[in-house]
């Protein structure tokens, strides 16, 4: 297990003061609901005191309500006790990156992250966005393993295991560092979606074709693979 640094000073008061695990999927281009540009804009507005929180919807409220039950069901099905719920960890190298883990359990004598999820979808493998979030948590905690119990479609319960992937963690953390730099400098990351271009250039698209989100994801993955091969 890595030598980690847990927060010794008061944890951040608001989302504008740090990059959390919920931001990881956006930073690596795996959040279909938000782009890095939109995330930076939100963080900047929070820091400026001009941001208005959107109203929660039924699914969001259900997720918050069901989260503790998912952790309890994980313990019921696996026999593993979940401790340290909502514990805060800070990344050992980047003080502006941290995470609140849903819980911590002890597996074969070593601590592991527990990240609960509820979804109306069914998937045989964890979506890449969740993997990015969990790898960010593993990078912050220094743990080598995470369990992701998922309550699917209101009737199915499945527990996924995610092992630490240092190379992918570096990719995720570096992307978060990039976005945070834009937040502090009050600049914006490169536009990645049609909405980004519309927000940035509302009156002029210049006649250029925009890459699809899927194409952008593929380019991001190719860059990561190229870096991984170079470092190997």
Task: Give each language-model segment a name.
Residues 1-69:
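Charged, glycine-rich intrinsically disordered N-terminal tails and low-complexity linkers that flank
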Residues 27, 39-43, 77, 175, ...:
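Residues that form generic nucleotide/phosphate-binding pockets
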Residues 59-61, 65, 76-183:
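Nucleic-acid nuclease catalytic cores
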Residues 178-189, 227-230:
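Short helix-capping and hinge/turn segments at secondary-structure transitions, especially at repeat
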Residues 187-215:
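Long, amphipathic alpha-helical segments that form or neighbor coiled-coils/leucine zippers used
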Residues 207-232:
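Contiguous, amphipathic alpha-helical segments that mediate oligomerization or scaffolding
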């Amino acid at each position: 297990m890595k030598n980690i640094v847990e927060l010794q000073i008061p944890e951040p008061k608001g989302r504008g003061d740090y990059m959390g695990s919920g931001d990881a999927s956006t930073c690596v281009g795996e959040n279909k609901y938000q782009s890095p540009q939109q995330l930076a804009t939100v963080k900047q507005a929070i820091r400026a005191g001009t941001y208005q929180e959107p109203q929660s919807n039924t699914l969001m409220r259900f997720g918050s309500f069901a989260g503790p039950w998912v952790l309890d069901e994980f313990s019921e099905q696996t026999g593993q006790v979940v401790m340290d719920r909502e514990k805060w960890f800070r990344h050992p190298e980047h003080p502006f990156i941290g995470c609140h883990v849903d819980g911590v359990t002890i597996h074969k004598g070593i601590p592991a992250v527990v990240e609960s999820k509820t979804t109306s979808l069914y998937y045989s493998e964890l979506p890449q966005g969740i993997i990015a979030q969990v790898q960010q948590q593993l990078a912050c905690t220094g743990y080598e393993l995470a369990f992701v119990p998922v309550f699917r479609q209101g009737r199915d319960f499945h527990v996924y295991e995610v092992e630490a992937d240092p190379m992918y963690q570096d990719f995720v953390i570096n992307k978060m560092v990039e976005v945070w730099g834009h937040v502090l400098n009050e600049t914006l990351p490169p536009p990645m979606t049609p909405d980004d271009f519309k927000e940035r250039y509302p009156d002029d698209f210049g006649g250029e074709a925009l890459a699809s989100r899927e194409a952008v994801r593929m380019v991001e993955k190719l860059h990561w693979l190229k870096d991984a091969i170079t470092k190997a």
